[in-house]
Amino acid sequence: MSIPAAQVAHLPTRIRRRDGSQAPFDNDRILSAIRRAGEASGEFAEDEARLLTSQVVKVLSHGHFPGGIPDIERVQDIVEQTLIAANHLGTARAYISYRDQHRRLRADRQTLVDVASSVNEYLDRADWRVNANANQGYSLGGLILNTSGKVIANYWLSHVYAPEAGIAHREGDIHIHDLDMLAGYCAGWSLRTLLHEGLNGVPGKVEAGPPKHMSSAVGQIVNFLGTLQNEWAGAQAFSSFDTYMAPFVRNDGLDYEQVRQYIQELIYNLNVPSRWGTQTPFTNLTFDWVCPEDLREQVPVVGGVEMACTYGDLQAEMDMINRAYIEVMTAGDAKGRVFTFPIPTYNITPDFPWESENAGRLFEMTAKYGLPYFQNFLNSELKPNMIRSMCCRLQLDLRELLKRGNGLFGSAEQTGSLGVVTINCARLGHVYQDDEQGLLARLDELLFIARDSLEVKRKVIQRHMDAGLFPYTKRYLGTLRNHFSTIGVNGINEMIRNFTADRDNITSEPGYALACRLLDHVRKRMVEFQEETGHLYNLEATPAEGTTYRFAREDRRRDPGILQAGSDKAPYYTNSSQLPVGFTDDPFEALERQDDLQRKYTGGT
């Protein structure tokens, strides 16, 4: 049909399909849909359909759409509104019913999993998920987990989360992590509780009392972490490992070689791919190095019997444990390959012995493998007992837990993250180029979707835990009230590049300032979320191993002109708000440039 020239000049030239791809805008398709709807209801025919189409086109010509491109749903909304305004209520009802019917059909198709395709994609390694997890090899267990994971993911997206969350994830605006598991993200546990009570308390399962010797303590730790790993998607952590294990060294009268043997057994057994999907359990151990002040006067209990000493008297035993752990990790396995787990985290406190032999061994291991994480308590108001580190980068600031009313130390080790949602920041920069107000408005929409999905997940996991789906979590944790909901960001460097048409990136002053404003905005919203929900929220520099590729691949498919890192065949986005890969090989320059940004993350970096 003919359109007035003035309207043609302002009409969109392209339209965005539901899968995110674009197609040429064709007003005749609008005319066809309206005409068929009118004929079906019997309210009007060709002439009225043309008049209504011209009204829809007029609205579109004056509309403001992200990137100047309307999506199909928005066009159909305008058609609906036009039919109602013209008093064609019967046609409008039929049109709305038609849309809803087809929406449900699309949802049903998305929920279905093509079994043959899923299995073949894995066997042929054609699915990017095959390599998305560095801890899961190509195996029968991986095939089973990959296939079942698609079913669970569709269950979350189609039957648990609100439709807007499913749409935002599928279209790559956000990434809801661990959709393939009906479980929480990561958890920290009390090693002291395990050693005092033993591995027991779950009906119908084998029980063990408190360990009396280091050998049985190591066995219970391995079994505990492996068992709990099967009830969580991510990392399982123990804190103060050297402090709590030192009494067993003293009680058994062990020499260094014996301690080293037990530590070797611990590390080897925690690197065996015994977890679902033939994965290695994702584990983290935090080492105090020097006995924390709040534990120094406390009396250890071994096998239910108090010892004739305090934790503060066991520094020599702690030193043996730390030496053994470092030497075993540095040596690697029988072929000299690095042990991936447990990831060690070391507390750097004012009394850290920098000149000791163990410190030298620690930094040699760091130089060789880059293995450990360090928690810096120098010039900090925080104390080691106030922070517990777990997972890749989830570092929990437990000052947030003071308001929970159950004491700081008692809840310190019983924390974690229930779920993670990452925002695709690169796309925001591309769609809202030079429009910071529009970018922040869309960011808010995505943050609200993230919040709502995390709140839903909290309710679902708590309900299933109460019903016995996670028996060991129920036994050793019981409540999720001290677990955070985590929101992360990805591709801030590419966001800046796209936002400024590549004039700036995160290394330039304007780009850095934009990154700071964005993170401050997210932090402000998260404080509001905490006040609204009564639940803990934190901002994490998401590792985004597979997510960064998924975002980039999806955006490249939608618009090949978007600025990305990597190559055409392997695009990616720079992790969180980090410097571009290869920008500098000077670690001190990198630290200086990232200092203010990294401090904005409340959940780890």
Role assignments for model-derived ranges:
Residues 104-481, 502, 508-605:
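Conserved catalytic cores of very large enzyme subunits
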Residues 13, 56-63, 247, 494-499, ...:
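Short, hydrophobic beta-strand segments
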Residues 35, 57, 451, 455, ...:
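Amphipathic, well-packed alpha-helical segments that form the structural scaffold of globular domains
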Residues 2-118, 122, 479:
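Charged, amphipathic alpha-helical regulatory modules used
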Residues 78-84, 288-289, 471-495:
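Core structural elements
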Residues 26, 30, 237, 485-492:
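Catalytic-loop motifs flanking and including active-site residues across diverse enzymes
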Residues 83, 87, 106, 454, ...:
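A structural signal for well-ordered alpha-helices, especially hydrophobic packing surfaces
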